[in-house]
Every structure is written in C-alpha cells, then in structure tokens.
Amino acid sequence: MNYFKWLFLCFLCTALPSCNSQEDKINGVSFVASRDVIDTTHVNPVVKVNANYAAVMPFGFIKNLEHPEIIHNTDRQWFGETRPGSKQYIEALRKQHIKIMIKPQIWVWKGEFTGEIMMTSEATWKELETSYSSFILEYAELANEVNAEIFCIGTELELFVKYRPQFWSDLIVKIRTIYKGKLTYAANWDEFRRTPFWDQLDYIGVDAYFPVSDNKTPSFEDCIEGWKSHKPIISKMAKDYKKPILFTEYGYRSVDFSGRKPWDSDHNMKDVNLEAQVNTTKALFETFWKEDWFAGGFVWKWFHKHSEVGGFDNPRFTPQNKPVEDIIRYYYKSEK
C-alpha cells in the first residue's frame, strides 16, 4: 500500500471513533413475520442497510397472563410465525449471506406484557413448563436443522424466570443436547441484572430500551449523557460473567420524547419526531458499537415490504424510509 495512503487511513481512523471495523459485530435487524413467503426483493433492503444478521421470530400465543397453554405452529397463524415459515425466511435470508438468530416469542392476548406471565398454582406452573418446553424445543430443532448462528431461548419473561429458575436451568441443558450453536436470552432492560442463568449462555441478551432523556427532542449530547448511568452497569455484567453483551432488541420510535420511555408502544403517541429518533439511535451506536465487550444488536423492527412501510409520517419503531435508516446504514457498514 502507498505510504501516504496508509498514513491518511490511519489519520481517518484516529479522528473518527466510529471508523473502527464492524466486521465482527452483529449488525442485525428484527425481521417481522408476515403472511407472505419472502424472496430476494424482500431481503435486498436488509443487505442495503449493511446488516449481516436477521432475527427470525416465530410466535406462540397464550390466552392471558395466568393461562399455561402456548399455542404454536398452527395453520391459524401467519406463515412467518410458524416453523415452515421461519425456515423459508431463513433460507431466503441465507441466499443473501445474512446470518440468523432464531428468536421465538410469545404473544399474550390483547398485548399484555409477557414479563408478567404468572401462574396461580404449582399445577399450572408445571403445565406452563411443559407447554413452553414443547414450544422452545421445536425451534431449537429448527435452529439445529438450519445451522442458525444464535438461538434465543426466550424473550422478556421476567416472572417466569424469577419463580421457576430450575426449570430454565434444566431447559438450557436440554437445548444444548439438540442445538450446538450460540445461546442467549432476551432480558428486558430492567430485568437483565437479575437473570440467574447467564453463566449457562453465550451472550448476555438485553432488550435495550433504557431511558436516556426526558427532553421532547433529545439532542445527541443529551442521549450520550443519559447512557452514562447505564453503561457502567452493562459493562460490569460483561466483565463479571466474561460474556459479551448482545442487544437482542434496540431502537427508538420516531416520536416526541423518544428517549424517555423507549419501550412504550402506545398507539396514542402520534407526534412524529424524526430528529429525536436519529439522535437517540446515533448516541446508542457511539456509546456501544466500538466496545470490545459488546457483540452488537438487532434493530426493532424491520418489515419485509420495505417500500410500503415507515416513512416521514410514521411514528412507530421501524427505521425504514426514515432518516435514521441512513444512520444505521452508516454504523453497519463493513470496513473490509
């Protein structure tokens, strides 16, 4: 390489902290299940945003927070929510060299929070454990079949984990007999410090909806400051367990006060604020993506019909067709 060209590149990477190579980072999208079979036209936008991973999310359904039966892989579900649909999505993504995390999730009727699933008796806890095992082991088998790089054993199930820790420890052992890849669990941002089985997994998974600013339009600097109370706790977890941190979900809505309660999906929040989404997202990247103990993350969320979703008047989480998509593309770029 020409000496002056080498010197110029060294200067650039010294001047720009985000110029560090992201070749080894998990630069992911949370690929939403739909009714449809997907093909190259649906995967191309994932490639164009420089993602190298997709979370494929089959679903199980439960009637209410006290109901022990999880219904899954039925012909009443959308195609992408089932095992055959998940496999088809994975095959389409693989053709474009996208790596895979399979992340089975539960939907509680009326959208109640899964972290509050709580049985009322030992008998119903046992029923739930049997049903959840059937659900999660089915997708562990799929993960093994398709050689998924990562398998997520659950998402935001705080009370289930709290009151049945031995079940979870035993479940991980069972999963390991079926699937030989990397394991994680998607703990909510206010749950991950209490999750008891990180020592049995490969990544400390966090759904990273940490509050970072109370301002209507938080500036980049506001959000950088807001992370200062959270980052030391997160990095200490990585150090204590000697495991990398993986943001199994991250992202912000394009609304006013997007950094105050980033987890809030209230449909009544309709005041679009694209700048707020850009600033919160950029601050997250600058805070974490350059850290060696940080594995990467999956932006929430990405729909298959790219040209028909998101946009400048959309107040939801998706970054698609919004200014923040370019921010993600920039930080996801590969320095090869």
Predicted regions and their residues:
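Bacterial Sec-dependent N-terminal signal peptides
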Residues: 1-23
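Boundary/entry segment of secreted carbohydrate-active catalytic domains
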Residues: 20-49, 57
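The substrate-binding groove and active-site-proximal loops of carbohydrate-active enzymes
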Residues: 28-33, 69-83, 121-133, 154-163, ...
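Substrate-binding cleft and catalytic face of glycoside hydrolase catalytic domains
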Residues: 52-68, 83-161, 257, 300-305
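Aromatic-lined carbohydrate-recognition surfaces of secreted/lumenal glycan-active proteins
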Residues: 101-106, 150-161, 169-193, 242-250, ...
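Aromatic- and acid-rich polysaccharide-binding/catalytic face
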Residues: 136-155, 187-227, 244, 248, ...
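Active-site clefts of carbohydrate-active enzymes
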Residues: 207-221, 236-278, 300-315
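Aromatic-rich peripheral "rim/lid" segments of glycoside hydrolase catalytic domains that contact
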Residues: 262, 278-283, 287-336
